[in-house]
Structures are given as C-alpha cells and as structure tokens.
C-alpha cells in the first residue's frame, strides 16, 4: 500500500487554472470524492482546496494506476487537459507524500510561511472526506501525525510569530499605499473565512469596515463581534459601494466574477481592489484610476516576509524531517507488531485444538490438561522466540512490506484476519 499526493499550488499553477480546479463548495467536494473513489485502486482519499493550493491525497494499492485515475478525474471536473495537469502537478509518493503533507500542515509550503489557517483547513478537509466515507484509518493516521508535526513547529519555532495570511498581506499592501488606514473606510465583500480575516486586520489597523454579503447569515454575528468599527449591508448595493469607496476587498465563493467593467462608474478618485478569492471575484483591467491586486500579485510582498522567516523555516524543516521518520517507523512497527500477535494467536489456537483432540481420544488424562497446556505454551513460546525477535527488527528494514507479505503467505494470514485480531495492539 502507498500514500500518493498530487499537488497544484501557486508554485506550479497560475490562478486561472487553480480556480478551475478549486473545490469551493461541499457539492463540488462530494462530486470529486465520488469520482476518485470509483477506482478500485483508490482505497482512501481526501481533497484539500484553499486559495493557494488544490491537493489530492490518496492511499492506494497501485501508485501508477491511482495517479492516472486522479488526473483523469480532475480533467473531467475542471476541463483542463490531462497533459497540462500532468505537466503542472507536483507528485509525491510514499515518504515524499508524508514529508510534503507535514510541510504543508506546518505552513512551510504556504505562500505566506507561518500562517496558521492551513491546519484548520487540513482538519476540515479530512473531516469532510471521513464523513463522506472517502477516508479511513490510513489517512486519519497521516493527518493526525501531520497536525502533531505542525504543533511542534508552532511551539518550538517562532515561525508563526506575528502570523500573516493572504488577507493580512493584502491589508499590509493597502497600508503601504495609503500610509495609514486610521479612520479610513474599507469595503469587504463576503463574510467567509478570508473576508472575516481581512475585516479583522483592517479594524486592527484602525479602519472602519463595511461588509457586503448575500444574506444576514453569520454576518450579523460577525459584525457584532468586530465591534463599533464594523457594519454590513446587502450585496444588492454592491454597485453603489464599489463606486463610492476607494478601498475594496473581495472574497466570496461565487463561481464567477462579481465585479466587472459594467458595474464601474467613472470617478475622480483612484480605487484599489484586492481580489483575495479563488475563483477570482474581480474582472477588471488596471487603469490610471483603478488598481487590482489578485492573490498572485501579492506574491512579491509575501516573499519579503518569507526572507525574514528563513532561519526559523530551517529549524521547522528539521522538525518535519524528524516527524516524517517517526511516522514511517510507526508504519513499519504497525507491520511487525500485528504480525507477531497474529502468528502467536494462530499457534495458540492450533495448540488448543490439538490438546482437545488428545483429550477426546484418551491420549491424555483430563487431570493432566492444565500441566499439558502449560507445556505446550512453553514449547510454542520457545519456538516463536527467534521469529518474534526478527519480526520486531522489520521496522529498521527498507523492504519491510515485502518481507511481511512473504510471512503472511507462509502462515496463510489474510489482511482481514490481521485487522480483526489486532484492533487493540498492546506493546509486546
């Protein structure tokens, strides 16, 4: 069995393709998970979709077949040709897939290194897949260890000190443009996660915020929590607000652009639009009166922040490497320990059966049963001593899975029996 990760990020895929791949609703996530699980080679899977990445994580019995199937599913979903997806994708297998996910969870692969949103996004992605019966114990273990690794990085480095996200970078860019945001009014379109973060950063910077949203759901509570500097209005007044104010942030989950040239009225003042949505919310051309910043155009500012965190990132990568090795050792241990327990159980069952036969045929007195059982137990314990020691050493061998497969064949151990006998494995 293998772990496989196929990754499309800001590093290898521009926003025009990423927005086609984005799974920005539960319906779309459910659709792609159903497609992925239609292959017998995909045992478990989950999808992680954020403004900067789309990743498919799979647990598979055949990496090549799974890889081809995943790319075909993404083509069916997005309309992007298979060849282009293969060319753009970063593909990680086995230990590489583990290391990559741990780096992602630790925010080392993020556009903004050190941002803390990604752990929550990873947990939510797993929960959705698990609730929809697409993920099980194998991806669960991997995500659990990934979150443990992220916690270590957070606690043992200062990489998340003064954490920043795409939203905060956009606000910082606005502050750079205007000099100060104190008492300035900014319009935030959308009350989702990114919009909420943008509003919080704006208010922290001294700005007043008007949140434009399609419905009152969530936004009323959000405005109340944000305090006196926040208010909200209906999306029906979108045209009015984007022509009245000069600082606009947009982060909705709309499948198409909501701000286009048809809505723009000529104004004497210069307007600054920050599009932090994927797919993009804004379809405008930069002019002498309009400047548009997308997720990708914020990259230069983000990279300056990355340079400041480089030293901490090196320490964090060391932790990711250690955590990867720990997880791989856990996987190998999880091969040997169930095998040991199952072989011992089979020996015990066989010994008990032969003892009962001896009693029935009169070869052994019932009064001697207890002593005979002890003797048999000592015999198979002595016989299995060396195999047990050697099996425990499997964890240090690169070909552990192949050796384990041979042992299962010799002892006629089926995978389902192995799982049933070893659901609660104690240390041996």
From Swiss-Prot:
Molecular function as annotated in GO: glutamyl-tRNA reductase activity; NADP binding
Record's catalysed reaction(s): (S)-4-amino-5-oxopentanoate + tRNA(Glu) + NADP(+) = L-glutamyl-tRNA(Glu) + NADPH + H(+)
Listed EC numbers: 1.2.1.70
Alphabetical list of Gene3D superfamilies matching this protein: Glutamyl-tRNA reductase, N-terminal domain, NAD(P)-binding Rossmann-like Domain
Site entry (Important for activity), positions: 100
Keywords annotated in UniProt: NADP, Oxidoreductase, Porphyrin biosynthesis
Amino acids binding substrate: 50-53, 110, 115-117, 121
Residues annotated as catalytic: 51
Binding residues for NADP(+): 190-195
Pathway connected to this protein: Porphyrin-containing compound metabolism; protoporphyrin-IX biosynthesis; 5-aminolevulinate from L-glutamyl-tRNA(Glu): step 1/2
Enzyme class: oxidoreductase
GO biological process, one term: protoporphyrinogen IX biosynthetic process from glutamate
SUPFAM superfamilies: Glutamyl tRNA-reductase catalytic, N-terminal domain, Glutamyl tRNA-reductase dimerization domain, NAD(P)-binding Rossmann-fold domains
Domain notes: Possesses an unusual extended V-shaped dimeric structure with each monomer consisting of three distinct domains arranged along a curved 'spinal' alpha-helix. The N-terminal catalytic domain specifically recognizes the glutamate moiety of the substrate. The second domain is the NADPH-binding domain, and the third C-terminal domain is responsible for dimerization.
Other information: During catalysis, the active site Cys acts as a nucleophile attacking the alpha-carbonyl group of tRNA-bound glutamate with the formation of a thioester intermediate between enzyme and glutamate, and the concomitant release of tRNA(Glu). The thioester intermediate is finally reduced by direct hydride transfer from NADPH, to form the product GSA.
UniProt xrefs under PANTHER family: GLUTAMYL-TRNA REDUCTASE
Oligomer status and interactors: Homodimer.
Family statement: Belongs to the glutamyl-tRNA reductase family.
Function: Catalyzes the NADPH-dependent reduction of glutamyl-tRNA(Glu) to glutamate 1-semialdehyde (GSA).
Name by which UniProt lists this protein: Glutamyl-tRNA reductase
Gene designation: hemA
């Amino acid at each position: 069995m293998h772990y496989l990760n196929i990754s499309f990020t800001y590093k290898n895929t521009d926003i025009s393709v990423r927005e086609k791949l984005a799974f920005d609703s539960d319906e779309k996530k459910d659709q792609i998970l159903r497609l992925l699980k239609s292959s017998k080679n995909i045992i478990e899977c989950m999808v992680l979709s954020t403004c900067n990445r789309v990743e498919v994580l799979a647990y598979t019995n055949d990496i090549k077949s799974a890889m081809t199937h995943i790319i075909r599913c993404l083509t069916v979903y997005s309309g992007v040709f298979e060849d282009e997806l293969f060319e753009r994708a970063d593909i990680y297998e086995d230990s590489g897939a583990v290391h990559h996910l741990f780096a992602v969870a630790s925010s080392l692969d993020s556009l903004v290194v050190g941002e803390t949103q990604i752990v929550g996004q990873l947990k939510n992605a797993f929960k959705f897949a698990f609730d929809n019966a697409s993920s099980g114990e194998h991806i669960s273990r991997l995500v659990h260890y990934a979150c443990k690794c992220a916690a270590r990085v957070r606690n043992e480095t200062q990489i998340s000190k003064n954490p920043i996200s795409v939203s905060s970078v956009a606000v910082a860019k606005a502050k750079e443009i205007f000099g100060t945001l104190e008492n300035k009014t900014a319009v935030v379109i959308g009350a989702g996660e990114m919009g909420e973060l943008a509003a919080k950063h704006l208010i922290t910077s001294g700005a007043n915020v008007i949140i434009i949203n399609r419905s009152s759901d969530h936004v009323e509570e959000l405005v109340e929590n944000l305090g006196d500097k926040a208010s909200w209005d209906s999306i029906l007044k979108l045209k009015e607000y984007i022509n009245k104010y000069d600082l606009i942030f947009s982060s909705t989950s709309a499948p198409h652009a909501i701000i286009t040239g048809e809505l723009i009225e000529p104004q004497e003042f210069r307007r600054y639009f920050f599009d932090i949505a994927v797919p993009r919310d804004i379809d405008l051309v930069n002019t002498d009166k309009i400047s548009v910043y997308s997720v990708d155009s914020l990259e230069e500012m983000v990279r300056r922040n990355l340079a400041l965190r480089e030293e901490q990132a090196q320490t964090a990568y060391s932790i990711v490497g250690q955590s990867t090795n720990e997880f791989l050792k856990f996987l190998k241990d999880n091969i040997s320990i169930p095998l040991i327990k199952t072989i011992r159980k089979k020996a015990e069952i066989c010994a008990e059966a032969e003892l009962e036969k001896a009693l029935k045929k009169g070869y052994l007195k019932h009064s001697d049963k207890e002593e005979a059982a002890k003797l048999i137990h000592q015999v198979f314990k002595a016989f299995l001593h060396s195999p047990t020691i050697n099996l425990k050493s499997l964890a240090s061998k690169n070909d552990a899975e192949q050796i384990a497969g041979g042992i299962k064949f010799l002892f006629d151990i089926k995978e389902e029996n192995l799982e049933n006998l070893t659901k609660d494995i104690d240390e041996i």
